[in-house]
C-alpha cells in the first residue's frame, strides 16, 4: 500500500475521530442542559452582590444591564455594583441611566483608576468587591443578559454539598456581518460543547468568565480574585484554585446570552488567536485535541488523498451528518441556525483550523488597547498602552 493511500486512510480516521468528538461534546452539552432545568429556589434566597466590571460600551450594553434590574429576586437580597476606572468611561452614563430607572434595586458605582495588575478586568472586580455586602458574588460581563429566573436557578447550586463556584455557558446572539456570524458559529457550535465535554469527561474545572457565581468563603480561601490580577485567564485559574481549596466547581448550561452584534474580521481574529494562545498555555498537550473540532480540514485531506471512491462517499456522508447534527442540537438548546448560518459552517471550520495553527506559536497579544506577552499559565509578562 502506497504512502499516498495510507495518508488518505489516516485523514479519514481523523475525520471519524472529529465526528466522534463532536458527538461526545453534543451529548455532554445536552446532558448539562437537562441538569440545568431544575426548579429555581423559592424562599430563603441568599444575598447576592452582582459585580459588573465595565470598560467601554459593549454591544447591547443598555439592554443587557436592564435585564439584571428585572431579575425575579426578593427586594433587598441583591445589589448591583458597577466598577469603572473613572467617571470618564463611556459606559458610565448608560449604567447610571439604567440604574436611575430602577431605584428599588440597590446600585453602587465604584471608580478606581489604580492598575495594580496587568488584568484590567480583575482590577475592576477587586475594587468593587471592597463594597460588596453579600456572601455570594456574581461576576458578570457587560455583554451578558439574563432571563428573570436566572439568579434563582444560579443560587440553587449552592444548596448542594460544598459548591464554591458555578459558571454559566453562554449563547451568542444578534450577529450581523460575516465575521460575527462565523464567530457565533464557533462560540455556539464548538466552544460550548467542548467546554461541557472537558468538564464532564475529564472533570476539569472549566470556568466561563462571562458569568461566575462564587461564594465569599471560597474567594477568601484562595486569597481573593486579586491574587490573579497578573494573569490573563483569571476565570480558569480561579476555578482551579477554588477546586484545589476543597470546594466544588460546577458548570451550568442554564445559558446566559451574550451580544455579538457586528465585529470586523480583524477584531474576531485577534480575539480568538488570543484565546487559542491562552488555551495552549493552560492545556499543554491537551491543546492538540482542538484539532478535532473542525471536521472540514479532515474531509479535504481525505479527498486530496482519494484512496477509494467508496471512502469518499462515506467521508462526504459523515461531514453532512456532522453539520446536520449541529443544526439539530442548535435548535434543541435555543440557537436555531438560519440558511446563511448553515452555509457558513464550512467557512467556520476552516477559520477554526487557522486559529488553532495561529495559537501554536507566538506570545504577543492585544487586549482592550494594551499589548502584552503571555507567559506560563497566562502570566502577563509585559504590558504597554498601545495595541499590538
Predicted regions and their residues:
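Catalytic donor-sugar/metal-binding loop of nucleotide-sugar-dependent glycosyltransferases
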Residues: 230, 236-258
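Long helical/loop segments within the catalytic core of UDP-sugar-dependent glycosyltransferases
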Residues: 99-130, 134, 153-222, 226, ...
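Membrane-embedded multi-pass helical conduit in multi-pass membrane proteins
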Residues: 9, 16, 20, 27-31, ...
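Cell-envelope/extracellular polymer assembly enzymes that use nucleotide-activated donors
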Residues: 46-49, 79, 237
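N-terminal membrane-anchoring/stem segments of glycan-assembly enzymes
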Residues: 1-44, 181-185, 193, 197, ...
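Acidic donor-binding/catalytic loop of UDP-sugar-dependent glycosyltransferases
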Residues: 90, 141-157
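A conserved hydrophobic helix/loop-capping motif in glycosyltransferases and polysaccharide synthases
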Residues: 48-57, 64, 71, 83-85
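Acidic donor-binding segment of Leloir-type glycosyltransferases
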Residues: 66-116
Amino acid at each position: 500500500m502506497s504512502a499516498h493511500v495510507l495518508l488518505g486512510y489516516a485523514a479519514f480516521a481523523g475525520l471519524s475521530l472529529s465526528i466522534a468528538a463532536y458527538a461526545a461534546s453534543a451529548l455532554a452539552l445536552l446532558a448539562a442542559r437537562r441538569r440545568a432545568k431544575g426548579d429555581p429556589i423559592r424562599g430563603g434566597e441568599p444575598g447576592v452582590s452582582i459585580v459588573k466590571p465595565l470598560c467601554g460600551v459593549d454591544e447591547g450594553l443598555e439592554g443587557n444591564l436592564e435585564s439584571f434590574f428585572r431579575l425575579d429576586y426578593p427586594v433587598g437580597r441583591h445589589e448591583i455594583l458597577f466598577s469603572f476606572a473613572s467617571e470618564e468611561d463611556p459606559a458610565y452614563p448608560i449604567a447610571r441611566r439604567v440604574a436611575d430607572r430602577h431605584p428599588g434595586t440597590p446600585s453602587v458605582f465604584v471608580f478606581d483608576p489604580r492598575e495594580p495588575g496587568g488584568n484590567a478586568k480583575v482590577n475592576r472586580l477587586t475594587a468593587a468587591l471592597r463594597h460588596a455586602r453579600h456572601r455570594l458574588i456574581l461576576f458578570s460581563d457587560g455583554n451578558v443578559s439574563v432571563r428573570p429566573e436566572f439568579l434563582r436557578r444560579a443560587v440553587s447550586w449552592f444548596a448542594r454539598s460544598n459548591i464554591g463556584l458555578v459558571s454559566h455557558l453562554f449563547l451568542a446572539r444578534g450577529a450581523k456581518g460575516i465575521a460575527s456570524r462565523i464567530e457565533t458559529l464557533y462560540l455556539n457550535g464548538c466552544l460550548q460543547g467542548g467546554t461541557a465535554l472537558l468538564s464532564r469527561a475529564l472533570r476539569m474545572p472549566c470556568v466561563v468568565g462571562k458569568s461566575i457565581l462564587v461564594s465569599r468563603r471560597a474567594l477568601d480561601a484562595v486569597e481573593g480574585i486579586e491574587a490573579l490580577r497578573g494573569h490573563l485567564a483569571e476565570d480558569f485559574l480561579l476555578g482551579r484554585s477554588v477546586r484545589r481549596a476543597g470546594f466544588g466547581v460546577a458548570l451550568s448550561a442554564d445559558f446566559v446570552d451574550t451580544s455579538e452584534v457586528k465585529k470586523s474580521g480583524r477584531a474576531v481574529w485577534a480575539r480568538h488567536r488570543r484565546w487559542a494562545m491562552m488555551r495552549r498555555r493552560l492545556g499543554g498537550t491537551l491543546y492538540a485535541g482542538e484539532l478535532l473540532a473542525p471536521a472540514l480540514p479532515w474531509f479535504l485531506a481525505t479527498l486530496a488523498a482519494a484512496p477509494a471512491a467508496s471512502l469518499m462517499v462515506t467521508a462526504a456522508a459523515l461531514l453532512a451528518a456532522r453539520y446536520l447534527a449541529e443544526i439539530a442540537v442548535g435548535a434543541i438548546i435555543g440557537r436555531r441556525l438560519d440558511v446563511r448560518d448553515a452555509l457558513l459552517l464550512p467557512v467556520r471550520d476552516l477559520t477554526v483550523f487557522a486559529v488553532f495553527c495561529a495559537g501554536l506559536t507566538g506570545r504577543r497579544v492585544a487586549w482592550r488597547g494594551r499589548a502584552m506577552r503571555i507567559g506560563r499559565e497566562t502570566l502577563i509578562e509585559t504590558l504597554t498602552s498601545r495595541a499590538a
